[in-house]
C-alpha cells in the first residue's frame, strides 16, 4: 500500500514542479500560520498531509518516513513524522519543540509553525504563534472543544492573530456525521464570541486520509465550503508590516577607528515599523531632541529609504548623544515614554509567579529591571471571566499585571504595534524566560 502511494506521489510531483516553474516564486505573497489545539488532535499529521498532498517534500524525506511507518507496523504513511524531528517526539508520537516548515503552491508561499498541544509546552505554542498571520485550531471530532482548545484560541486572540481556521479533525472516526460537526461549531462559536477575532472559519477534515485537506471529499458531500488548502491560498491577509508608526530602536553606536571615517557616527538597528527616508526629521526618545537623517547605510551601501524588517545604520545631521535603547520616531507620531507598564502576561515559568521576586524586562533593545506593582486579575480560560479573587499565577496562566521599570521605556500598545508593544520577563535568579507580555 505504501509503495503504491509513493509511485503515485512521484508522478504527481513532476506535474507540480512543472506548474511551479511557470509561476514566479518571488512574486507570491507569504502567509505565516501556526497550528493550535490539544495533544493528539492531529496537528502534525495535518501539516504532514498538507506537505505531502501539495508535493512539497523531497523523495528522500518521503522514503525515510515510509520506512519509519513500516517499522511501526503501519499500512499507511505516518505523516506526523514529517514534522516531529526530535527523538523524543518520534518515540512518544507527540510534538515538543516548535517545528517550522516551508512550502509553496503556485498561488502563495507558506511558513508553518507546528506547535505542541501538551499543556506543559504552551510556552512553545506562544513562541510559534507570535509572528503568525493565521491560526489553524484543530479539534478532535470525538472530544469537541476542550480547555486546551480554548487556551490556544485565547492566546491567538491576545497575539492579535486576525484569522482563525477551525479544522474539525478525525471526522472519519465519527462516520463523517454532519450533526456532530454542527455541535462542535456551535460550541466553539459560543466560546469565540468573547474573543477579539473577526474572521473564524470552520472546515471538517480527516488529516489521516486527506479528506478536505487539499482535495474535496465525497464522504463530506454535505459540506459546501472550501478545502483547507484553498482557504489558505485565498484568504486575504493584510500586510504585517506597520508602515504608519516609525520606530527605530538603537542597537549599537558605530564609531569606526580609521582615518577615512574618523568623524563618522552611525546608529545601527532594525526598522521595527514605518518608513525612514534621507532628509526626514526625526525625534529622539526619551530626550525629545529633533534632528534629520543624513544618510542610511544598508550592507555598506547608501540607500535613500529603509523599512521593516531592514537592519540598517542611520547617520544623523546633528551630533547628539545617543545610546542603545534610545529610539528614533517621527515628531508627530511618538511612542509613549513611561516607567509604568500595564500588560497581559502569559506565565511560562515552571514555578509560580512571585510578585516579590526580581525580574528583568526585555523590550526592543532595552534591558531593565522592574518591580511588580500589582496583579489585577487572572483569566479563567473556560469562561474568559476575570478572576479577581484568586490572584496566584502558575504555569500557563494568563493575567493582567502592572510593573514599574528602573528607567523609562518607549512603547505602544500591542494592538497598535507588535514590536514595541511586546515584552519578555526574565527571572534574575535563574536567567530563564518566564513570561511573555502584551502591553495594553
List the model feature ranges, each with a label.
Residues 115, 119-120, 130-151, 161-165, ...:
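Conserved Switch II/interswitch segment of TRAFAC-class P-loop GTPases
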Residues 182, 189-351:
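Conserved catalytic-core segments of large NTP-driven translation/proteostasis enzymes
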Residues 40, 46, 65, 93, ...:
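Residue-level signature of catalytic and energy-coupling elements of molecular machines
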Amino acid at each position: 500500500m505504501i509503495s503504491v502511494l509513493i509511485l503515485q506521489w512521484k508522478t504527481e510531483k513532476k506535474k507540480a514542479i512543472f506548474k511551479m516553474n511557470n509561476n514566479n516564486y518571488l512574486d507570491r505573497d507569504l502567509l505565516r500560520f501556526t497550528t493550535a489545539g490539544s495533544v493528539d488532535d492531529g496537528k502534525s499529521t495535518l501539516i504532514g498531509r498538507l506537505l505531502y498532498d501539495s508535493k512539497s517534500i523531497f523523495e528522500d524525506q518521503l522514503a525515510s518516513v515510509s520506512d519509519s511507518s513500516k517499522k511501526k507496523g503501519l499500512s499507511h504513511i505516518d505523516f506526523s513524522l514529517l514534522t516531529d524531528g526530535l527523538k523524543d517526539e518520534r518515540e512518544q508520537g507527540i510534538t515538543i519543540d516548535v517545528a517550522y516548515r516551508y512550502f509553496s503552491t503556485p498561488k502563495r508561499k507558506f511558513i508553518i509553525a507546528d506547535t505542541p498541544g501538551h499543556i506543559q509546552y504552551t510556552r512553545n505554542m506562544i513562541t510559534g504563534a507570535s509572528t503568525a498571520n493565521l491560526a489553524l485550531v484543530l479539534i478532535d471530532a470525538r472530544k469537541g472543544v476542550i480547555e486546551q482548545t480554548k487556551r490556544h484560541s485565547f492566546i491567538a486572540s491576545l497575539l492579535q492573530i486576525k484569522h482563525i481556521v477551525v479544522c474539525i479533525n478525525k471526522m472519519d472516526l465519527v462516520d463523517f456525521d454532519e450533526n456532530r460537526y454542527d455541535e462542535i461549531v456551535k460550541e466553539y462559536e459560543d466560546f469565540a464570541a468573547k474573543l477579539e477575532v473577526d474572521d473564524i472559519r470552520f472546515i471538517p477534515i480527516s488529516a489521516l486520509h486527506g479528506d478536505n485537506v487539499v482535495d474535496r471529499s465525497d464522504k463530506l458531500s454535505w459540506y459546501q465550503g472550501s478545502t483547507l488548502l484553498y482557504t489558505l491560498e485565498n484568504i486575504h491577509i493584510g500586510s504585517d508590516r506597520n508602515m504608519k508608526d516609525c520606530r527605530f530602536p538603537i542597537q549599537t553606536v558605530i564609531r569606526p577607528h580609521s582615518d577615512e571615517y574618523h568623524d563618522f557616527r552611525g546608529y545601527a538597528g532594525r526598522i521595527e515599523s514605518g518608513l525612514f527616508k534621507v532628509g526626514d526629521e526625526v525625534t529622539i526618545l526619551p530626550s525629545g531632541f529633533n534632528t534629520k537623517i543624513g544618510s542610511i547605510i544598508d550592507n555598506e551601501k547608501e540607500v535613500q529609504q529603509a523599512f521593516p524588517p531592514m537592519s540598517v545604520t542611520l547617520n544623523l545631521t546633528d551630533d547628539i548623544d545617543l545610546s542603545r535603547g534610545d529610539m528614533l520616531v517621527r515628531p508627530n507620531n511618538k511612542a509613549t515614554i513611561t516607567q509604568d507598564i500595564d500588560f497581559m502576561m502569559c506565565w511560562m515559568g515552571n514555578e509560580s509567579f512571585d510578585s516579590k521576586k526580581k525580574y528583568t524586562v526585555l523590550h526592543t533593545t532595552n534591558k531593565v529591571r522592574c518591580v511588580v506593582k500589582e496583579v489585577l486579575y487572572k483569566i479563567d480560560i473556560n469562561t474568559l471571566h476575570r478572576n479577581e479573587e484568586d490572584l496566584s499565577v502558575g504555569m500557563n496562566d494568563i493575567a493582567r499585571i502592572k510593573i514599574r521599570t528602573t528607567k523609562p521605556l518607549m512603547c505602544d500598545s500591542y494592538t497598535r504595534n507588535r514590536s514595541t508593544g511586546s515584552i519578555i520577563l526574565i527571572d534574575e535568579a535563574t536567567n530563564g524566560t518566564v513570561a511573555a507580555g502584551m502591553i495594553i
